[in-house]
From Swiss-Prot:
SUPFAM superfamilies: Dehydroquinate synthase-like. Zn(2+) binds at residues 173, 239, 256. It catalyses: 7-phospho-2-dehydro-3-deoxy-D-arabino-heptonate = 3-dehydroquinate + phosphate. GO terms for cellular component: cytoplasm. Gene3D superfamilies: 3.40.50.1970, Dehydroquinate synthase-like - alpha domain. GO terms for molecular function: 3-dehydroquinate synthase activity; metal ion binding; nucleotide binding. Belongs to the sugar phosphate cyclases superfamily. Dehydroquinate synthase family. This is 3-dehydroquinate synthase. GO terms for biological process: amino acid biosynthetic process; aromatic amino acid family biosynthetic process; chorismate biosynthetic process. Pfam families: DHQ_synthase, DHQS_C. Keywords: Amino-acid biosynthesis, Aromatic amino acid biosynthesis, Cobalt, Cytoplasm, Lyase, Metal-binding, NAD, Nucleotide-binding, Zinc.
Length: 351
């Protein structure tokens, strides 16, 4: 199956379960992590024909998604003597996808790259859309670029080796899309047998459907708003809170999808307090998150510090915090006129 991301410039296709043979008449640089290399690199290498292939592995995890690791990646790219016609392949989860895309965008002012995501989270979100970047002490993804891949290959077979925790984290991003764009997808999610899904014993078709539904939706959004000036901001539902949580826990306590799950609960509580969402809908999201073993609570130590951290969010401007809220489920809105008092009231409910 193929989904085209129809951008004015740099249009590309996402191939779902169609990774057969990749031929290049140039050098190829594969960026991965030790775990994915051990599990799947042999399979990938059997499908690639190129003048020369270089492989670099970096530590996995959001805590390593920083400028220090980026320097390592770039050094290995220079040592591999890549030129402007070389191709970088990001082979891993969201962290690898973000860093690989960023490295490709700045190496000699830009080389082509291909995403081959190996986690559900990367398939449904990180690998498509052209957002690249790294974290720093001030927050998540604050250093980065918009840089589109030449192609994306999502293989459901790679997902079979994921842990239940990683699968649940990917599901959180799918729930996010459903809650903000299409509540009929929530019906689909509620019908999934969570046991076989979390054990990765479900039919490949389930993974394929989740990936296809997500990518089709995200592709339409990115086509209308590639640089996140309006509609695309809705994809950040749950993320305004999640990014603060991740930063405050040094990116070590939660997987990104887990932080997003908590962020959605917080965003829904804010919407509930503002009369934009009813209690039944808020509870529905909690129930779906719990169904997949995702966290729904976080203890805020300092409400004032948490509030101030919002202003490092990329969606904020002129001392105004733009919150993405569901109102109702299946329809998102961006609200930038919420008083400090209302925000603080919601945050206090998580102390």
């Amino acid at each position: 199956m193929q989904v085209e991301v129809k951008l004015k410039e740099n249009a590309y296709k996402v191939y779902i379960d169609e990774l057969e043979e990749l031929e290049f008449d140039t050098k190829v640089f594969i960026l991965s992590n030790p775990k994915i290399s051990g599990l799947h690199l042999k399979t990938l290498l059997s499908k690639i024909k190129a003048k020369e292939i270089s492989i670099a592995t970096v530590k996995d995890g959001e805590e390593y998604k920083n400028l220090s690791t980026m320097e390592e990646i770039l050094s290995q790219m220079f040592n591999s003597k890549l030129d402007r016609k070389s191709v970088l392949i990001s082979f891993g989860g969201g962290v690898i996808s973000d860093m690989g895309g960023f490295a490709a965008s700045i190496y000699q002012r830009g080389i082509d790259f291909i995403n081959i995501p190996t986690t559900l989270l990367a398939c449904v979100d990180a690998a498509v859309g052209g957002k690249t970047g790294v974290n720093n002490n001030f927050g998540k993804n604050l250093i980065g670029t918009f840089y589109q891949p030449k192609a994306v290959y999502c293989e459901s077979s790679f997902l079979k080796t994921l842990s239940s925790r990683e699968l649940a984290a990917g599901m959180a991003e799918f729930i996010k899309m459903a809650a903000i764009f299409d509540d009929s997808m929530l019906d689909f999610i509620e019908k999934i047998d969570e046991k076989s899904f979390l054990n990765a014993t479900c039919e490949n078709e389930i993974f394929t459907q989740i990936i296809a539904k997500s990518i089709e939706l995200k592709a339409r959004v990115v086509e209308q708003d590639e640089k996140e000036s309006g509609l695309r901001m809705l994809l950040n539902y749950g993320h305004t809170f999640a990014h603060v949580i991740e930063n405050f826990t040094d990116y070590k306590l939660y997987l990104h999808g887990e932080a997003v799950a908590i962020g959605m609960v917080m965003a829904n509580q804010l919407a509930l307090n503002l009369g934009l969402l009813d209690k039944m809908q808020s509870q529905r999201i909690k129930d779906i998150l719990l169904k997949f073993g995702l966290p729904i609570s976080y203890k805020i130590n300092s409400v004032d510090e948490f509030y101030e951290a919002f202003f490092m969010d990329k969606k904020s401007s002129n001392k105004k915090i733009n919150f993405v809220l569901a109102s109702p489920l299946g329809k998102g809105l961006i609200k930038g006129d919420i008083s400090k008092e209302d925000i603080i009231t919601t945050l206090r409910e998580f102390q």
